[in-house]
Structure formats: C-alpha cells, structure tokens
Amino acid sequence: MFKKRVFSWFGFKKNKTKINDLDDHIKKNNQDNLSQKKCNNICSQDSIAKSTKSDCCSENVANSSAVNESHSSSLMKLKLKQHVSHVNNKNSFLLTLTTKLVRTKEAFSIKLKNLFFKKKTYNSLLDDIEEQLLVSDIGVRTTRELVDSLIKVSTQHELKNLNLIIEILKSKMKKILNKVEGPLNINYKNLFVILVVGVNGVGKTTLIGKLAKNYKKKGKSVILAAGDTFRAAAIDQLKLWGEINSVSVITREIGSDPASVVYDAIKIAKLKCIDILIIDTAGRLHNKNNLMEELKKIKRVIHKIDSTISQETMLVLDACIGQNSIKQVKIFHESLNVTGLVITKLDSTAKGGVIFSIAQEFLIPVRYISFGEDFEDIQVFNSNIFVNAILSNNTLK
C-alpha cells in the first residue's frame, strides 16, 4: 500500500526594492536559484516515487496473477474432489441398496431372468412377465403400464433379449418414481417440526432415532417430543434414542394429553432456538376416528402456537404389508394432509414393489427409505438408485 504524497507549492514574495539596487538584485537572483533547486529536487523526488510505484504495481499485478492462478487451480481441484465424492457416494448407495434389498431384487431381477431359460411364445412370455410383476406386489395399474411399454417398444424377436427387456422396464419404472422423488427441504431460519405418524409396528420410533442422528451429523440442533403417552415403553424407547444421540426428550406422565407434550416441546424448542423438533405419536389403526382426531388436535396446537412454523407430516409405511399400504395412505392423507412418506423394512420383504403403486395412486413425496436397524440403514429416496438396485445388472449376467 502506498501513502498519498502531499505536495506543497512554493510561492515567491515580490521584491519591494528598486531594480537598480544591485545588492537587492543579487539577493533576488540567489533566492531564485535556491527556489529553482528546490523545485528540481521536488520534481526529481516525484519522478523517483512514480518510478518506484510503477515497479511495485507491476510486482503486485504479477503476484496477484500468481495468486489468482493458484486459487483457480485449488478451486478446480476442490470441484473435482466434490464430483468424485458425489460419484463415490452414489456408487456406495447403490451397493448398499443392492445388498439390503435382496428379497425385492430377487422378486424382480432373478425370477425375471429365469423366465428366459425356457422357450416361450411371445404371448406366453408377456403373460409370465406380467404375472411376475404382480407377484412382486407392484400393483395392477403399474403392471399393466409396464407390460404395455414392452408391447409398444419390443417386437417378438426383441422380447427374447433379456437385457433389452430390463432396460425398457427400468426406464418406465424410473419415470413413475421420478414423480415422487422429493427430499425434505428444511428452512433452518425458523423451527421446523416433523410430526411422525403411522400404525403400530411400522418403525416410527426407530426412524426418529435415525433422523435425529442424521440431522445432528449435519450440525443441526434437534429435540424430541414423546407424543405417545399411552405406553411407558414408548417413552423409554424414545429416551434411549435421545441419550444415544445426545438430544433432549420432552415427556409427560403416562396418560397425559399428547397435545400438551407437543405444546411444551414447541415452547422449549423456540426458547432454545432449536432447528428441528421431531414428534413421536402413538401407533393407531387408520380406521379409528378418535385417534385420528387426536392427531388433528396436535396439528392445530402447532399452528396455534406459531402459524409461521414449517411443518412436515411424515407417514411411515411398512413395506412388508404390501398393497395394504395403499389404504393407510388414503385414510391418513384425507385426515392429516400427509406431506411426506417413509418406506421401512425394505430389507425384510419381497413386496418392495408397493412403492410403485403408492407413487401411481398418490403424488406424495417419498422422503426416505429404511432397510435395517442400524443408524446407517436409511437413505434419502433416489428413484434411479432404487430402480438400479432392484434390477441390478450383476443379477442378469
């Protein structure tokens, strides 16, 4: 950095004596010569300063250029590293799902492959493919669309090409699931509330533990509310997840009004500037109106405390029950306006195809899929990865 130079301009006083006065004339000449020397010195110094400044600027430009090149190189390396990490993550997710979804994959890939070992006519092969899709619990509507896509695209000769058939099915399946691929976008500027609902035994509390762990890893503050006040075991289980994840759990005594627990939890969460509040609720049959009314009351309490609170009503579904999930989604959605779905226990069933029926029947985003008891056994739903996992190429060779 260069300081500004302040240049003083020198003036000269007029000689009050007569010009013919020799002494004064000589004195004036001496003063003029002295002033001229001072001016010359100033000009010389100014010239040197400009030269020095020019040299320094050139050096700064060179240094700046080198820094920019270094920064650009570092940025390129960072982007490349992020891209490689993204690709590795996708490959890791695919490998994990392919391993975990063994039963669903067997229902699709392996049994479909076995159809091609025997000589079949065009129509009989189509019938067998249709039957296998139905057995996979993919649903009548989706099965019909998949078979129709095979008829439109493939000829009698091409239908005997297993790899071609698989690619046609994968393309159509991805189009169906793309409509419900919707990660949960959380606005961390205000408290975000996740109300977890579902029937008994679908894995709500385990899911809450996984979500808490996931958001904590992202550096977000989380608090849990034990809205299932009917079972002491439910409260104890949620407390255990809270201890494991080092998050607070808001509870009340057994038999308390669940809405009062939610009220306390929201007040505390807002007071402590918590990012995410996850509410556990009692498992209930979807045909019990009084229990559904209780969930509606909880939603009203949330809105009454603060109408600006962002809220997700997350319905948890057990993949093991197959097509029965359709009725659950219908009832819960009509009563509570479900905003997101989670499909659990995909590792324990061959009925994972139900996700296609749900996607066709309802346009509710699938937030997560879960496939085990470990914290890592949960993934944000990705339609491409899911379809590639259940129709993985290594089972077709």
UniProtKB/Swiss-Prot annotation:
InterPro entries: AAA+_ATPase, P-loop_NTPase, Signal_recog_particl_SRP54_hlx, SR_rcpt_FtsY, SRP/SRP_N, SRP54_GTPase_dom, SRP54_N_sf
GO molecular function: ATP hydrolysis activity; GTP binding; GTPase activity; signal recognition particle binding
Keyword Manganese: no
Any GO BP: SRP-dependent cotranslational protein targeting to membrane
Bilayer-spanning residue ranges: none
Enzyme class at the top of the EC tree: hydrolase
Protein origin, superkingdom: Bacteria
List of residues binding GTP: 198-205, 280-284, 344-347
Record's keyword terms, sorted: Cell membrane, Cytoplasm, GTP-binding, Hydrolase, Membrane, Nucleotide-binding, Receptor
Protein topology in the membrane: Peripheral membrane protein
Recorded catalytic activity of this chain's protein: GTP + H2O = GDP + phosphate + H(+)
Pfam family, one: SRP54
Cellular component aspect of the GO annotation: cytoplasm; plasma membrane
Compartment list: Cell membrane; Cytoplasm
Ion transport recorded as keyword: no
Predominant place of localization: membrane
UniProt EC number: 3.6.5.4
Subunit field text: Part of the signal recognition particle protein translocation system, which is composed of SRP and FtsY. SRP is a ribonucleoprotein composed of Ffh and a 4.5S RNA molecule.
Job description of the protein: Involved in targeting and insertion of nascent membrane proteins into the cytoplasmic membrane. Acts as a receptor for the complex formed by the signal recognition particle (SRP) and the ribosome-nascent chain (RNC). Interaction with SRP-RNC leads to the transfer of the RNC complex to the Sec translocase for insertion into the membrane, the hydrolysis of GTP by both Ffh and FtsY, and the dissociation of the SRP-FtsY complex into the individual components.
The family this protein is said to belong to: Belongs to the GTP-binding SRP family. FtsY subfamily.
Annotated protein name in UniProt: Signal recognition particle receptor FtsY
Species whose genome carries this gene: Buchnera aphidicola subsp. Baizongia pistaciae (strain Bp)
Organism phylogeny: Bacteria, Pseudomonadati, Pseudomonadota, Gammaproteobacteria, Enterobacterales
Gene: ftsY
